[in-house]
Amino acid sequence: YNRTLKKAERWADEYGGRIAATPREAAEGAQIVFACVGNDDDLRSVVLGADGAFAGMAKEAIFFDNTTASAEVARELHAAARERGLHFIDAPVSGGQAGAVNGLLTVMCGGDAEPFARAQPVAMAFGRAVTLIGPSGAGQLAKMVNQIAIVGLVQGLSEGISFGLAAGLDMKLVLAVIGKGAAQSWQ
């Protein structure tokens, strides 16, 4: 299932499988459902309601959400899952497109330990580190820590470049040199 039918068709053509008309249809019979959408509202739209994934999931199934969303929506959907006899793990990722393509994402998880332990080996197919940080919402909060750290790195690089330019340095040369030392960052 994809909210954009053309994307689902392309994926099915390339990798095989069947296209589901709704999240509910896609989730029917699955022990673990993985999802990654744009934001809180998108997440609610694919999870809740008569055609949402929760409606099609069997008791004790796990919804493993890789969306970068709010900790509040993670807690909300965790509670909604519990009411239905399901499990919800908030599991935002870090590593960018290259990490996703190469199975090297870092996955920061929030939720209950038992369903996490069941889902972790499956998530290792796309993650090099899949870690339970704490209760529901903790994965989203850890992702916020990650984003704050990245912003600090980008800000520091900007300040360094500004300083170097003001000092009259050849910044192409400086960046090439510091890129081989402790200032190296894949970002």
Where are these regions (language model features)?
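NAD(P)-binding Rossmann-fold cofactor-contacting core
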Residues: 1-15
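Small-residue helix-packing motif on alpha-helices
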Residues: 8, 26, 116-119, 174
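Rossmann-fold NAD(P) dinucleotide-binding segment
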Residues: 19, 23-87
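Rossmann-fold dinucleotide-binding core
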Residues: 37, 68-147
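Helical "substrate-binding/catalytic lid" subdomain
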Residues: 118, 138-187
